[in-house]
Amino acid sequence: KNIRRVIQVNQAPIGKTQRSTIVSYLEIFDEIRALFSKTDAAKQMKLGASSFSMNVKGGRCECCQGTGLQKIELNYLPNSYITCPECGGKRFNDQVLSVKYCGKTILDILETPIIDIVNVFKESKKVYQTLSSMIELGLGYLKLGQMSMNLSGGEAQRVKLAKALSSSSYGKNLYILDEPTSGLNDVDIDKFIQVLFSLQKNGETAIIIEHNVEFIKTVADHIIDFGISGGESGGKIVAQGFPEAVFANKVSSLYRLDKLTY
């Protein structure tokens, strides 16, 4: 009754090939391509939504098949990639790149930092909400056309969370997060904390696996401490309860870590 949906967000990669991009993972590319296909220029040239895809024939550069890169196979060495000599890394043919939506080409949308293009999509609720979530989580510097396989574990986790936030109606969702502060600087951690507080205000619950003492102090309502041991020696609850009580408990690993921090 109290939990409507469980959303697990971990640091596993969100893509394994060049075809997997941030925009495709976020599931907003269909809406973006539809917006381009509805422009007068696209209609005059009879360019449908599929013409603005890198993954199918029609509008993409066939030399690189829409990746913007060409693979160079080397004997006894890892494969190398060079910019496509046909399109110069632009992924699409000239006809498609002549079409603009709100002054932007499809390449502009894919290759410009999210924070600089979010307002282009104010009239598209899903796209705008998703990009806004990315910015709130400190990912405004990413580009939609980036290969998702190149994201760090921390970035991948926040992209997953942004997708979940934009696709879930608030209330009675349970988020399970695995070390979300891993690899984040203090500024990004602060942004992430504000997102968690926002979730809490909207009736959401989060279970977080974390080792960052300051982060735990700031966000936790209830702590379950499994101690510092791992393997066969771990997995035992050494303390639990309100944060103040756990940090004051001399048996707790957080008590010792907190003393070391200061």
Please describe what each predicted stretch is.
Residues K1-Y262:
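Conserved phosphate-binding elements of NTP-dependent enzyme cores
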